[in-house]
Structure formats: structure tokens, C-alpha cells
């Protein structure tokens, strides 16, 4: 609504006096019971904002982008602001090279994971420079402002709400994998065709290859073999029933509020317990909030708010993925059996080492856990000095403490394979295997503790003066001081025994390890404990800012806005010229509908507003610096001296990233029932890039400014209310946006692998999107053997040269990120019944399909591990001459393997199967339409509520993630998640107030 008051974090101002691109949505309109945080509910709700999920596990934060990508090396997330307080990025001490931390990254959450959606009143998204410039350097990726519910000045009100949610369990009907019979016969056909294995299959009663070898070596009779074969064909183990579940979640919220005009209060407590679809993944969270308002005198208002949150998320060890295992494991395997996973020569004992594996055992004896405790307090003081002058002080403090751990016990295959060398409890202390093991007891534990505290202090002077009803002035002067300190430790220990009081058993001292071959050198595992096991970080970022805003409305139809902010950061320590970053914006709007001509002749045009803005935004990469970054290490073996490593050489010219923004918009409302907004924007960013350095610098690369990024786009929002009566109403909401993104000139050499991989952290080719990728050009299958063939890659050796651009023999496949997003919502009400629907649409992205040969070994030339299942697409592979007319799936790799041949630019070529996997034959549209929610609610009539002494009562039923329409070539996988699915869920809720 044009007359509503917009809370922009720093000030309250009428929307009609704002020129920037702003979208406000009410939290109650987007609540989805199957999600626990507000960021997960935003997909398809706002034009120009792309929300994509990376995992279906509970506790995982989605990826959010507003108006494309404006940085290559920096944080691309929007700035989150809660009740005027900037939420600092949560920094976690995780070693990027440590495999055990990968499972933790998925469940830690983000800046607003602590916030209970039930406490939120509305969400405002700021998109252009005029709207975001007031937030300075942190706002270059857009701003998401959250306003929590305010106190009521009424009698005591108590509200209770509850939601109970059931999520659907996955099943094999959703996917395209072979059943037991198909998998056994596929192995038989491959064996008959002479396809090789990377190593001789083990003798194992759980695999076809295992019993075939046992038959060949006369360990079983032909009759026994046939019986085992028939049993395997009909076993059809349902891994989804063993590893996943119908998840159950429940949420409860209690709130109280009341007070008078002099003093009001509100308090709320929320509890959520959510199970993931994978057995072992769950989240438990409790939140609390207290808000007090005191008005000792008419012109002075004091608000105090306290927030708290305690959360625990359980996940899996890095090598344990139930969903992936269920889809990729051979269904002939008995789920309770231990099958051979490794059978090889142990160089230390001089013996053949046999290790067995059972996934359920692996899952039950490993895991990861993330615990988070969040607390924040804010004080807001408003003093109305004059009727048109207000002073406001805002102070905020927050503390986020997290404890994370990932572990694997001595009972796991991981420990046996990586450290011990034999199955748990399979040898005696006097055996050669035991004496050769440096970790005969215990497993491994990775712990990570983080404490981040930040404060925010604001002093603002706001001027709001109406010279007459049609001329208004709004101005603001302010300063802000922000500081964020993150301290963390990470530690990895060996010998962890959780079932014996969580003790640590010391590894065997290297001098006591008895091995006939290859004894351990140095300290072995003990050396890792001292040199790599422990890590600590202590990082502080300080910002001092001064800002001002100006908004003037003349005759209620001509509006001018101006914003300026100056940020100073300690990131650019020594160079005072780069330490300060001014951001500014200007905007004009013309409310044509207020002109006399429209008022007299075109009254049905209730709103017609033209807007235009320009602004400059800055962005500081807090993890980069123009200074020398030297890491002091321990003692260098062999030299017996302390040593240091260079993380970054000095670059005094490194400065803030800068983005220039233009935005033009039109707001149109007809008959007060049809509202439309159309926006066009352009953005040009000078981003920090990574450049390669000569060998003599002693470091591979450095950061510098100079990566030009262009974004332009169109956004469209429509709201239509064709019927609005007392007992019946219908509302339709539609939003759509298209973003064109491309990189500027780049002089950095790129190899073939970079173009095939694509991505958006580097500019690959001028004029192409940042997420562009290329593929080999598929030329069909060889009719004689089913081998894939390709265009442009085979040239005479004398014509090959390192100077050849890889894109001359690769074909452009598109971009991995969607360039068109949309959302559609219907709201229908009949008396006390309401029906709401929500759809999201993402178009334009391209993805590589999962390859049916992905589990084949030896670069795709050898059969997969017998324990792996394979895609049913291989039933439609090339099998005989003539099949190449009907299929593009290569035949089994029985052709001679080509080794050592090169591409036109002399890069080494991959195998034919690997090239086919990265060819345009395997590129598919990643576009999809998802029905996110269908909700039905019933509101009890007031007279009925009075009979039960209730103020209100509502019952609601919701279905989330009902269906998704995407390319059939995904064969059941969700195009958003690629290798998993978003589970359908059903919920029943109650809301009652007294």
C-alpha cells in the first residue's frame, strides 16, 4: 500500500516518500510448517530474489541471491537486519582441507537460524542502491529486513499455536535404478562381453561377481550357485525402508502480551523438534523472546528486547550419506550382512588385508552434531525533542556460541581402512596385524568450538516535517559503530572411545610398532596430533559509519531521495585512502496519478508512479587484505627450525569492490484492485579477482581489483483482487524476474577443465555469464562398438598449440544458475474457510545429468564395484550395430583404451566415457515449477469463540512440496538438489488465543 509506513531499519517513513526498490511481505502469508527458519520460506515470493536449496536435511540454510552476482571472491549472501540491528556473518573455524568438516558445514545454519518464524511480523527486501545505500558496504548483495511483532496495548492476551508435520519417505518408484534381477543380469551380460574390473572381484556371497568367482574356483557347486543366483534375483532389498523414514516434526509456540500506553510487554517461547527423512538426521530448537516498552513521559519511549535460542542438529559423518547409499547400492545385498569392501596387500604386515562393510553399522558408530546457543539484547530509546525532531539511540549486543563435532568409532570401516588395517575385534593382541597397527584401539574425533560476539551502536537524529498536507520533509543524520569478534578452536584426536566414558586411548608409539615391511617414520599419527590436530582463530572486524538520508515530497507527487554513507574498516589497515568507503544514491519519482488531469479524468488509475535511482555501493572482503599474510608454523622436519608460510603477498592497491546501480520503476494501481510493479536495473561491479603469479613470487596467486561484472534485469510484480466481499474474496499474486549476467574482459589463461567445470567464482570468457560452462560436442556412437564420438577434438599433431582457445573445440552449454525466477500465489476465502497456494518457478539453468557410468571405475572403462547399483538407463545402452540410431548411451566399454592423446590446445584428453559424461548429450534444462504449498484453514466464528472463552481459534491443514515439474531426464531426482529429493509433507495446526 502506498500510504503504509515502511520500517527500513534506520527510520520509519511512508512508502509514498520512498523512491527505492522495496518489497514487503507479511510473515503470516509465507509460513510453511515443514520449514523451521524464515529463509527457507522465501522461495518464489519476491521478484529478483533467487532462493535455492542445496539439501533436504533439516538445519540446512538455502542459498539466496538478490539481483544476480556482484562479487567473485566475497560473500554473496544478502545482509540480514533484525529490528534495525545488522546480523553479522557467523564465522566458523573449519579447516577447508579437512574432510571431516564437510558434514558439519551443512547443518550449522546462518545468521537468522536462531529466529523463530512465529515472532516475525513482516519481511522487507531492499534491492536497489537507493534502498540499500544507507547500510553501506555490507549491503551490496541486497538487504533482508525482519521486523518482529510489537507489543499490544490491550488486556492480557495469550496465544498458543501447534503444528504437527509428517514427511513422506522416499521409495524406489521415484527413481530410475535397477532392481535385483536387472542388476544381476547386467553383471552377467558385462561378464559375457568381457568388460574388465579394476581388481578381481572378491569371493562374497553378497554379490553376483562374488558367487561367480566362487563357482569358477570350485568353492561352491553349480546347484549352490544357481540357488544363490535365484535368491539374488528376487531379494530386492528396500534400502529406503532401512535408511529413511516418514519423518515427524512438531512445533509449539506460546506468547503473552499486554499493557497500556505507558508500559507494554510481550514474551514468547517456541519449541521445534524436526526429524529429517534420513534416520539419524534431526533438529531440536528452543527459542525465547521478551520485549518491553516503557514510556515514562509522552515524548520518551524506551524499548528493550531480549532474544535467546538453543539448537542441536544431528547429522552424519562425512563418508556416511543414507540417501546416496540407498539410491546407489545394489539391491541384492542383505542389509544385515557385512560384505567385503577391500581385499588388498598390506605393505606393513606383508599380508592380504580383508575388510568388511555394513552401512547401518557405519551410520550407528559415527556421526556429527552441531550445538548452538544464541543470545541477543537490544535497547532502543526514542526522544521526540520537537514535534518534527526525534533522537534515537539503538544499541545491540549478540553472542553466538557453537560446539560442533564429528566422529567415527573403532567399530567403523573408516577407522579399519584408514588407520588400523583389520576389522574390529578380528585379531588378537599377539597377532602381526595388531602389532603393525598404530591405532589398535579407538577411533577419531573432530571438535570445533566457536564464540562470536558483536555489538552495534547507533545514534540518529530524524527530522520529519509536513509544511502542509502535500509537502513533507524527512531527513536523518546518524552514526553507527559495529564490531564483530570471532574466536574459535578446532581439534582432531585419535583413539576416541565414546562407549567407555568418551575416553581417549593413546595410539601406539611408533618405536613399538612391529612391522616386517615399511615401519612408520617419524611420529606417525602422533605427529599429526601435534602438527595438524589443533587450530585456533581470533578475528575482529571493526566498522565506523556516518550516514544521512534526505526525502522531500513536493505537492504530494514529486519526490526526491538522497542517501550517503561513509564506512571505515580495519580491513584496509595502512592505506587511509582505501580505509574509507563512501556510498551514495539519488532518486526521483513522479506520482502522475496525483496530477489534476488524472484526478479529474482518470480516477480509475488510483496509482501511477514513475521512479528512477542511481547509486554507488562498496563491498569489503573481510577475509582478504592488502597486507602481507604470514602464517607462523611449527618446526620444519629435517631442518629443526621454526618456519612460516606465505598466505598472501602485499598488494597496497587492493581496495573496496564497487558497484554502480541504475534502477527505473513504474507502480500502477487500477480501481484499487489491480496493482502492478515493473522495474529495470543495471549493475556494474569492479570485483576482486584471483590472478596467477610467476614461480619466483613464492606463491601461486594473489587478489586484485579488476574483474568487471555486468548485471541487468527486469522485475514484474502483480497483485489482483477481482473479488472482495464480506463472505467471499479472491486474490492472485504473481512475480517474475529475469537477470542477464556477464563477465568483462579477462586475460587469465583457462584450461579445458575450467570451461567444462564452469562456476561463478571466476570470469571464464568475456561476454558470457559468470556461471557459464562448456561441453564436448557429441557426434554420436560408433556403429561398430558403441563408443562415443566427438566433434572438433581430433586435429593433426602439427596443428595443436597451447594458444588455442578451448572454446573453439567445446560448445557452450549455458549457465548453471537460473536467470528467470517467478512465483504464483492464489488466496481464496469463503466465510470462515481460506485456501492458499504457492508456486515457485526457476528457469534458464542447465545441469549435467548424473551419468549411468558414474560408478564405473578406471575412468569409466571398467565395471563398477559389485556392491553398487546402476541406473536403468544402461538397459537402453548400445548393444549391437544399429542401436546407435535409437540411443545415445554408449555401449559397455569393450573398445581399446586410448592413453596419452591430447586435445587441440595440448591439454590431456579424458577417456571416451568421461568425455561423454561432460558432453552436450548429458546437458539438460534445470528449469522447474514447484508447487510449494497448498493450505486450508478454518477460522472459528466470534460467537462460537465467546462460548469457549477464547479470543480466536483457527485450524489449518497444509501440504508442502506437493509436486515439481521438470525434465523427465532427471529420472526422479529433484532438479534443485540434483542427487536427492525434496520430501512431500503434510501438517495439521492449531492456533488459539485467549
Region annotations inferred by a language model:
Residues 82, 105, 130, 213-257, ...:
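Outer-membrane beta-barrel transmembrane strand signature
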Residues 4, 96, 806-807, 866, ...:
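Coil residues (strongly favoring Ser/Thr
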Amino acid at each position: 500500500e502506498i500510504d503504509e509506513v515502511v520500517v527500513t531499519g534506520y527510520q520509519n517513513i511512508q512508502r509514498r516518500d520512498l523512491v527505492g526498490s522495496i518489497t514487503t511481505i507479511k510473515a503470516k502469508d509465507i509460513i510453511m510448517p515443514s520449514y523451521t527458519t524464515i529463509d527457507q520460506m522465501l522461495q518464489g515470493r519476491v521478484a529478483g530474489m533467487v532462493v535455492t536449496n542445496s539439501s533436504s536435511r533439516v538445519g540446512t540454510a538455502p542459498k539466496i541471491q538478490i539481483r544476480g552476482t556482484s562479487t567473485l571472491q566475497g560473500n554473496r549472501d544478502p545482509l540480514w537486519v533484525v529490528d534495525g540491528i545488522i546480523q553479522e556473518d557467523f564465522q566458523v573455524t573449519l579447516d577447508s582441507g579437512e574432510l571431516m568438516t564437510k558434514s558439519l558445514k551443512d547443518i550449522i545454519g546462518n545468521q537468522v537460524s536462531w529466529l523463530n518464524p512465529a515472532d516475525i511480523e513482516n519481511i522487507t527486501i531492499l534491492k536497489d542502491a537507493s534502498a540499500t545505500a544507507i547500510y553501506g558496504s555490507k549491503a551490496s548483495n541486497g538487504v533482508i529486513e525482519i521486523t518482529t511483532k510489537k507489543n499490544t496495548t490491550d488486556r492480557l492476551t495469550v496465544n498458543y499455536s501447534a503444528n504437527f508435520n509428517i514427511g513422506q519417505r522416499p521409495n524406489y518408484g521415484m527413481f530410475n535404478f535397477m532392481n535385483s534381477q536387472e542388476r544381476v543380469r547386467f553383471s552377467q551380460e558385462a561378464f559375457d562381453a568381457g568388460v574388465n574390473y579394476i581388481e578381481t572381484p572378491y569371493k562374497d556371497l553378497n554379490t553376483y561377481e562374488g558367487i561367480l568367482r566362487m563357482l569358477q574356483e570350485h568353492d561352491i557347486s553349480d546347484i549352490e550357485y544357481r540357488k544363490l543366483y535365484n535368491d539374488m534375483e528376487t531379494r530386492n532389498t528396500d534400502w529406503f525402508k532401512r535408511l529413511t523414514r516418514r519423518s515427524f516434526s512438531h512445533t509449539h509456540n506460546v506468547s503473552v502480551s499486554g499493557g497500556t500506553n505507558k508500559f507494554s510487554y510481550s514474551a514468547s517461547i517456541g519449541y521445534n523438534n524436526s526429524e529429517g527423512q534420513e534416520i539419524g538426521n534431526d533438529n531440536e530448537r528452543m527459542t525465547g523472546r521478551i520485549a518491553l516498552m516503557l514510556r515514562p513521559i509522552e515524548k520518551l519511549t524506551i524499548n528493550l528486547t531480549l532474544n535467546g535460542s538453543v539448537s542441536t542438529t544431528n547429522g552424519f559423518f562425512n563418508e556416511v550419506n543414507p540417501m546416496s547409499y540407498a539410491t546407489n547400492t545394489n539391491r541384492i545385498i542383505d542389509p544385515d550382512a557385512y560384505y567385503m569392501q577391500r581385499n588388498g596387500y598390506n605393505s606393513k604386515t606383508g599380508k592380504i588385508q580383508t575388510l568388511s562393510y555394513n552401512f547401518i553399522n557405519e551410520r550407528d558408530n559415527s556421526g556429527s552434531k552441531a550445538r548452538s546457543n544464541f543470545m541477543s539484547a537490544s535497547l532502543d530509546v526514542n526522544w521526540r525533542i520537537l514535534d518534527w525532531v526525534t533522537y534515537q539511540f539503538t544499541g545491540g549486543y549478540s553472542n553466538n556460541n557453537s560446539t560442533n563435532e564429528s566422529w567415527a568409532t573403532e567399530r567403523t570401516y573408516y577407522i579399519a581402512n584408514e588407520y588400523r588395517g583389520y576389522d574390529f575385534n578380528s585379531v588378537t593382541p599377539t597377532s602381526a596385524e595388531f602389532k603393525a597397527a598404530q591405532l589398535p584401539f579407538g577411533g577419531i574425533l573432530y571438535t570445533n568450538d566457536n564464540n562470536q560476539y558483536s555489538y552495534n551502536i547507533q545514534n540518529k537524529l530524524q527530522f520529519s516535517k509536513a509544511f502542509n498536507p502535500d509537502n513533507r520533509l524527512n531527513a536523518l543524520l546518524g552514526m553507527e559503530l559495529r564490531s564483530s569478534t570471532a574466536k574459535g578452536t578446532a581439534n582432531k584426536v585419535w583413539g576416541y572411545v565414546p562407549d567407555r566414558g568418551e575416553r581417549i586411548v593413546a595410539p601406539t608409539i611408533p618405536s613399538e610398532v612391529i612391522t616386517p615391511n615399511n615401519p612408520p617414520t617419524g611420529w606417525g599419527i602422533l605427529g599429526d596430533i601435534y602438527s595438524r590436530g589443533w587450530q585456533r582463530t581470533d578475528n575482529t572486524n571493526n566498522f565506523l559509519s556516518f550516514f544521512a538520508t534526505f526525502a522531500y515530497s513536493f505537492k504530494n507527487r514529486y519526490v526526491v531521495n538522497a542517501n550517503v554513507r561513509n564506512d571505515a574498516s580495519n580491513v584496509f589497515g595502512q592505506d587511509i585512502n582505501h580505509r574509507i568507503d563512501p556510498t551514495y544514491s539519488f532518486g526521483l519519482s513522479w506520482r502522475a496519478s496525483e496530477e489534476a488531469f488524472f484526478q479529474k479524468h482518470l480516477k480509475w488509475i488510483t496509482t501511477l508512479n514513475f521512479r528512477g535511482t542511481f547509486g554507488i555501493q562498496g563491498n569489503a572482503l573481510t577475509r582478504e587484505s592488502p597486507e602481507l599474510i604470514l602464517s607462523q608454523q611449527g618446526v620444519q622436519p629435517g631442518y629443526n627450525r621454526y618456519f612460516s608460510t606465505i598466505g598472501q603477498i602485499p598488494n597496497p592497491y587492493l581496495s573496496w569492490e564497487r558497484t554502480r546501480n541504475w534502477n527505473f520503476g513504474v507502480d500502477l494501481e487500477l480501481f484499487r484492485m489491480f496493482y502492478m510493479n515493473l522495474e529495470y536495473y543495471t549493475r556494474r561491479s569492479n570485483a576482486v579477482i584471483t590472478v596467477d603469479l610467476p614461480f619466483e613470487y613464492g606463491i601461486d596467486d594473489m587478489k586484485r581489483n579488476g574483474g568487471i561484472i555486468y548485471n541487468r534485469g527486469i522485475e514484474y510484480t502483480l497483485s489482483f483482487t477481482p473479488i472482495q466481499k464480506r463472505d467471499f474474496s479472491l486474490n492472485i499474486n504473481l512475480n517474475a524476474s529475469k537477470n542477464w549476467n556477464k563477465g568483462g574482459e579477462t586475460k587469465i589463461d583457462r584450461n579445458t577443465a575450467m570451461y567444462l567445470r564452469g562456476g561463478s567464482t571466476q570470469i571464464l570468457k568475456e561476454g558470457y555469464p559468470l556461471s557459464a560452462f562448456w561441453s564436448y560436442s557429441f557426434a554420436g556412437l560408433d556403429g561398430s562398438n558403441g563408443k562415443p564420438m566427438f566433434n572438433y577434438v581430433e586435429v593433426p599433431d602439427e596443428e595443436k598449440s597451447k594458444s588455442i582457445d578451448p572454446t573453439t573445440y567445446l560448445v557452450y552449454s549455458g549457465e548453471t544458475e537460473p536467470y528467470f525466477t517467478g512465483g504464483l500465489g492464489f488466496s481464496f476465502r469463503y466465510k470462515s474457510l481460506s485456501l492458499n497456494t504457492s508456486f515457485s518457478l526457476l528457469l534458464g539453468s542447465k545441469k549435467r545429468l548424473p551419468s549411468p557410468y558414474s560408478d564405473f571405475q578406471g575412468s569409466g572403462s571398467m565395471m563398477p564395484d559389485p556392491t553398487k547399483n546402476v541406473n536403468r538407463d544402461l538397459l537402453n545402452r548400445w548393444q549391437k550395430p544399429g542401436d546407435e540410431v535409437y540411443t545415445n548411451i554408449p555401449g559397455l566399454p569393450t573398445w581399446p583404451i586410448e592413453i596419452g592423446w591430447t586435445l587441440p590446445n595440448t591439454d590431456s584428453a579424458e577417456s571416451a566415457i568421461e568425455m561423454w559424461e561432460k558432453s552436450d548429450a548429458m546437458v539438460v534444462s534445470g528449469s522447474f515449477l514447484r508447487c510449494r504449498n497448498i493450505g486450508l484453514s478454518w477460522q472459528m466464528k466470534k460467537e462460537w469463540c465467546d462460548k469457549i472463552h477464547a479470543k480466536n481459534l483457527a485450524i489449518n491443514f497444509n501440504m508442502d512440496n506437493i509436486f515439481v515439474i521438470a525434465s523427465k531426464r532427471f529420472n526422479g531426482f529433484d532438479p534443485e538438489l540434483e542427487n536427492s529429493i525434496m520430501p512431500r509433507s503434510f501438517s495439521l495446526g492449531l492456533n488459539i488465543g485467549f
